């Protein structure tokens, strides 16, 4: 009899242990693997149990390379579960060569897996002139109402063709209003003048800037504001971008061009009255992300957006994992080596 009791006790303990393990692991990546997106399970770290969805959907700045690299950094060095979504062609290939917008006004782009935005704790987003079907756009609109953080890189401020059909209080909301600025032209020479980041001294203690030193990239400075649309009062500028005279890292500044805001924070409140933290960084080409400062700011922004500022360490690793040989930005695809590739190519 005692032996039977011991056996039942053992079975009960095992069942309880497994149930507890399942509970503790319930926050693990709840996104099914697919040949249309990438998934990275986080290791043990501050981000354990948090899910970051990253979107790569542009045609110029090689986000199909930089975004998976960021996902590896976040998952392997910081413990975040990550899902990477891409714009794909009719064959299911990542295809930066597709026109944006299409000449055929009936055609639409496709970003499979946007339903996973509903499971995201944070979104990192880089798209350019995506013309998506309304059911895919709805996933964005729902996220904009979620109160969760949004990190918008480079061309995200003109990320959708024709603007948003997102409304708040019966009013159409623009990306300018949501992100705090939108592309109004190339202040720096397009593909000719690199950018040197200059920390705004009044805001140098902001958590996103912890451990950030050198900031440089080959993408030019965007003009996102003018006299009619000045830098918003509800935004906090963190970095000014100084155009350089060429694309070399040690190039002197172009003194004929003033530095303009390239990184700022703000808050956004959607239709549910929930407040989101927003970080907009108008640098962000794949080559820019070779720079440690650019990577660290983006990683720090995830922590900041999630209210995890105390977990930001100035010496935490943002080292690139594996080979990272980003192609240059531009539209001369054959010369640059850009072509449609299977999703797994970017794993």
Please state what every model-predicted region is.
Residues 1-6:
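Positively charged n-region of N-terminal signal peptides that target proteins for export
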Residues 7-19:
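Bacterial N-terminal signal peptides
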Residues 25-47, 66, 76, 92, ...:
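Extracellular ligand-binding/catalytic regions of CAZymes and related secreted enzymes
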Residues 29-37, 75, 81, 108, ...:
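Catalytic beta-strand/loop cores that center a nucleophilic Ser/Cys/Thr
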Residues 38, 53-55, 59-159:
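Helical hinge/lid and interdomain linker segments adjacent to catalytic or ligand-binding clefts
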Residues 50:
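Nucleotide donor/acceptor-binding cores
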Residues 57-60, 128, 191-197, 213, ...:
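Active-site rim elements
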Residues 116, 125, 129-211:
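A glycine-rich, often tryptophan-bearing local segment used as a flexible ligand/cofactor-contacting loop or short
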């Amino acid at each position: 009899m005692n032996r039977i009791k011991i056996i039942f006790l053992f079975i009960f303990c095992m069942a309880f242990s497994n149930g507890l393990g399942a509970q503790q692991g319930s926050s693990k990546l709840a996104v099914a693997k697919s040949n249309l997106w990438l998934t990275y399970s986080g290791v043990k770290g501050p981000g354990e149990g948090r899910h970051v969805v990253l979107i790569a959907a542009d045609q110029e700045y090689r986000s199909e390379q930089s975004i998976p690299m960021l996902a590896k950094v976040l998952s392997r060095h910081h413990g975040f579960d990550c899902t990477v979504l891409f714009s794909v062609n009719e064959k299911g290939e990542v295809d930066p060569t597709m026109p944006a917008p299409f000449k055929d006004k009936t055609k639409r782009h496709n970003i499979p897996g946007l339903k996973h935005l509903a499971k995201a704790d944070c979104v990192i987003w880089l798209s350019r002139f995506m013309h998506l079907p309304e059911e895919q756009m709805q996933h964005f609109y729902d996220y904009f109402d979620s109160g969760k953080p949004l990190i918008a890189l480079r061309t995200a401020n003109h990320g959708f063709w024709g603007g948003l059909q997102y409304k708040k209080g019966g009013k159409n909301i623009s990306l300018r209003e949501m992100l705090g600025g939108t592309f109004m032209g190339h202040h720096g020479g397009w593909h000719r003048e690199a950018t040197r980041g200059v920390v705004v001294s009044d805001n140098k203690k902001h958590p996103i800037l912890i451990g950030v030193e050198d900031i440089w990239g080959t993408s030019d400075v965007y003009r996102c504001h003018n006299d009619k649309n000045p830098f918003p009062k509800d935004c906090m500028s963190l970095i000014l971008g100084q155009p350089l005279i060429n694309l070399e890292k040690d190039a002197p500044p172009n003194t004929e061009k003033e530095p303009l805001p390239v990184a700022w924070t703000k808050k956004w409140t959607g239709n549910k009255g929930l407040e989101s933290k927003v970080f907009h960084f108008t640098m962000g080409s794949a080559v820019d992300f070779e720079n440690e400062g650019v990577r660290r700011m983006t990683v720090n922004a995830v922590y900041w957006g999630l209210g995890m500022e105390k977990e930001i360490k100035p010496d935490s690793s943002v080292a690139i994992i594996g080979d990272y040989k980003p192609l240059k930005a531009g539209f001369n695809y054959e010369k640059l080596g850009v072509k449609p590739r299977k999703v797994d190519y970017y794993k």
